[in-house]
Amino acid sequence: MKKPIRVIFSDLDGTLFYGGPAKCTMTKENENAIQRWTAAGNRFIIATGRPSSIRDELMERHQIECDILACNGAKVILDNQVLWSKEVGPEQIREIMNLCEPYGDKVDFALDMDWTEWVVLRRHGFVEENYGGAIFNTTVEQYISVPREMYPNKIFMVCADMEIKMRLMSELSEHFEGRLEVTSSGQDNIELGCPGVGKDIAVKEILNLLNLDESQAAAIGDEVNDLSMLQCIPFGFVMSSAREEIKQQVPREIGSVHQLIDWCLEYNNN
């Protein structure tokens, strides 16, 4: 007997934010659809590479109810409770700095964590250039020079071009094999997180905690770091706007989050 879909996992950048009226905002169609979905007693879970603090911003700005799978699964908040938070330690951060050193100003990275300011490798680098609205008062060197209560759930790295990205990504994967997960959420970036962390792993653990089958979840995304999530359940959808090499790896395709929600509601009603 068919079971209804009860939870939707949605990527943010390039997915939920696709077509929004301003940077980091969603369309009114997506907002209304999420409200309809949760009003029907279902869950909407943000599945993103971003820190978990984005959840509160979305709930306030768009009047939606949601949980979050943050930093590619390194931190999960469900029903306002932190289920887990896995951090990259200072020793590993130092190793990353050393591997980036030969690239000079062609590579920059930030520590992804719920903090009021961004911690960056270099001032006035690529991260600051691309995210000028954020606050940049502390460098990575300054941050790891003294013991801290909080370390990042993920490292977000920006490269000058695709060639550098692919070369460095290969070096990082080889150096940290078994110690850090290396992935990407865009053509110019690299993301590093704790081993055994991934959107797919977090999705399966959340479904287990909610006593839901894999067939009772749907997911949507558009990038490399979404692929494991889209491929681990029957109803994984890739955004029509995604790059061809991403779309080729996911059998189901759809145009937007609100279209997926409509699809799920129709599926449940038939």
State where each predicted segment sits.
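Short hydrophobic/aromatic-enriched beta-strand-loop microsegments
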Residues: 65-72, 86, 129-132, 236-241, ...
